[in-house]
Amino acid sequence: MTIALGKFTKDEKDLFDIMDDWLRRDRFVFVGWSGLLLFPCAYFALGGWFTGTTFVTSWYTHGLASSYLEGCNFLTAAVSTPANSLAHSLLLLWGPEAQGDFTRWCQLGGLWAFVALHGAFALIGFMLRQFELSRSVQLRPYNAIAFSGPIAVFVSVFLIYPLGQSGWFFAPSFGVAAIFRFILFFQGFHNWTLNPFHMMGVAGVLGAALLCAIHGATVENTLFEDGDGANTFRAFNPTQAEETYSMVTANRFWSQIFGVAFSNKRWLHFFMLFVPVTGLWMSALGVVGLALNLRAYDFVSQEIRAAEDPEFETFYTKNILLNEGIRAWMAAQDQPHENLIFPEEVLPRGNAL
């Protein structure tokens, strides 16, 4: 029996090889297999958003004006979520709700579902693009792993949270002021700022900003003076092989400042990757919990004492009262289809009132 070792070569290229050669060709803008998902989905998501914010009203879903055509500006325009009565329908243009009528589809909130789903797949396509390029140039895939953080947040907030609630209606609309309203909603109905997963997310994002500032300043501080240029950008050749700054000097500086410092670049840069990505993932997990209506921290003993003792109040009990006020005011404003009416006597009043 003879075993032949060697690389198998095909006599002629099949369709897959031809497509692979064209998609992965070296060009100004890399396409790749991931581009088949990324570019169409990104085009449709952005196109849907620009169309919605320019022309489409939210009168039939939220009782609001939300387009430039109606007088909104960049901060107040939005592509609004579908009506609560449509629950979790995919709102396909050819589906039973719109029945192929594009105008009706826009009025019902079909553009939101269109933008959300295509946006999610576009983000996934962008992550796959980073995987594909990393593999092509023999890099490790940490860029793609890092980008999983924003994807996790987007999917949890825009898709998983409303799936856990009664419908897409309770997802954020795609607009600046609309996102602000959603944040207030999260605080009032879920006490989001006291949720430990939100705390970890804030620590991750702000900690990452601090790390970036410290790292950038430290590198600038310890640059080798081996160029004739007057500033950082002229003094160094962008293709030079040698290092441009002194890790040893940086280590000594921070050892004197804090008493501790990173001793090697791998651990330093892994930490800069770990902090924000972990923070984003923790936030995403917290939002998944909110989809299931899991509660934040409750300090019931303080609430009971505040109810019994007019002179006892903490920042926590004041925030609980504020949340009740947000719910009482926002529910009626935010869900006009429910015809909610709250009499004056049930509205929250703090000890100071």
Swiss-Prot record:
A plastoquinone binds at H215, F262. Pheophytin a binds at Q130, N143. GO terms for biological process: photosynthetic electron transport in photosystem II. Chlorophyll a PD2 binds at H198. It is a multi-pass membrane protein. It comes from the Eukaryota. It is an enzyme of class 1 (oxidoreductase). It is found in: Plastid, Chloroplast thylakoid membrane. The chain crosses the membrane at residues 41-61, 125-141, 153-166, 208-228, 279-295. PSII is composed of 1 copy each of membrane proteins PsbA, PsbB, PsbC, PsbD, PsbE, PsbF, PsbH, PsbI, PsbJ, PsbK, PsbL, PsbM, PsbT, PsbX, PsbY, PsbZ, Psb30/Ycf12, at least 3 peripheral proteins of the oxygen-evolving complex and a large number of cofactors. It forms dimeric complexes. NCBIfam families: psbD. 2 of the reaction center chlorophylls (ChlD1 and ChlD2) are entirely coordinated by water. This is Photosystem II D2 protein.
